[in-house]
């Protein structure tokens, strides 16, 4: 049996471990996001063995020196356990970033978009907007029975709900095309969809800002009404021409 098949067989035995790790990390993320008032969907997965084998084969071909042992493959593949945070509002990315840095031990972080190689099609839009993190669980934040999960890496991806949906479509079409590489027309359509997603993100940011402003306005009205009612209850009254007048002495 060749090395890559040996690795896949070994990984299959550890699949439940990585799935449990993802469940634990996702649970932590859900809790801190909820307590901070960030609306998001949090999902997790252990990497599918079939997809993992395809990825390892691709990476092995591109390496200057092929994998020499199973340990090398484990060290090279960072997303055996993955957690995805799909934000309802893209404007929450910065706050989510700080929460992740507080909750996990960060090995590496990367912000997209980035341009790693010249594209075959010149994009008009900027592509994938997201933050990726490679992390470990913090030992002080898990139960004693869960400390064994602190030894494995987790990849966390944070993007808007819209961006994650577009990314899934693009990834499957580009990396797993049914027949050959995509044509310029297909790439142009993907680019067009990306533009619609980016426009949607702007709309979501405006929606969030409008909602926050509405809440602030309602709170301001409530506070003013409460302030006025309190004064009247205690015998204080506003005078004509003044927004509010406070008089000293006992209520009479």
Model-predicted regions and their roles:
Residues 1-80, 87, 91, 220, ...:
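Charge-rich, low-complexity segments
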Residues 1-17, 150-252:
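An acidic, glycine-/histidine-flanked metal-binding catalytic module
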Residues 52-63, 126-134, 225-237:
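Short, charged low-complexity intrinsically disordered segments located at boundaries
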Residues 74, 86-206:
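Long beta-strand-rich cores associated with HINT superfamily self-processing modules
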């Amino acid at each position: 049996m060749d090395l890559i098949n040996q690795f896949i067989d070994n990984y299959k035995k550890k699949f439940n471990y990585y799935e449990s790790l993802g469940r634990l990390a996702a649970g932590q993320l859900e809790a801190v996001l909820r307590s901070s008032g960030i609306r998001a969907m949090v999902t997790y997965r252990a990497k599918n063995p079939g997809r993992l084998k395809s990825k390892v084969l691709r990476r092995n071909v591109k390496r200057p020196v092929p994998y020499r042992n199973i340990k090398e493959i484990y060290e090279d593949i960072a997303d055996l356990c993955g957690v995805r945070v799909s934000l309802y509002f893209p404007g929450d990315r910065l706050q989510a970033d700080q929460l992740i840095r507080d909750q996990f031990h960060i090995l590496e972080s990367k912000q997209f978009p980035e341009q790693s190689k010249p594209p075959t099609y010149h994009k008009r839009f900027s592509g994938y907007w997201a933050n990726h993190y490679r992390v470990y669980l913090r030992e002080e934040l898990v139960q004693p029975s869960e400390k064994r999960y602190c030894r494995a890496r987790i990849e966390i991806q944070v993007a808007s709900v819209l961006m994650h949906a577009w990314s899934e479509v693009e990834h499957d079409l580009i990396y797993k095309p049914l027949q050959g590489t995509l044509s310029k027309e297909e790439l142009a359509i993907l680019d067009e969809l990306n533009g619609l997603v980016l426009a949607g993100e702007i709309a979501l940011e405006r929606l969030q800002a409008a909602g926050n402003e509405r809440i602030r306005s309602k709170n301001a009205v409530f506070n003013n009404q409460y302030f006025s009612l309190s004064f009247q209850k205690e015998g204080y009254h506003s005078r004509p021409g003044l927004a509010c007048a406070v008089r000293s002495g006992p209520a009479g």
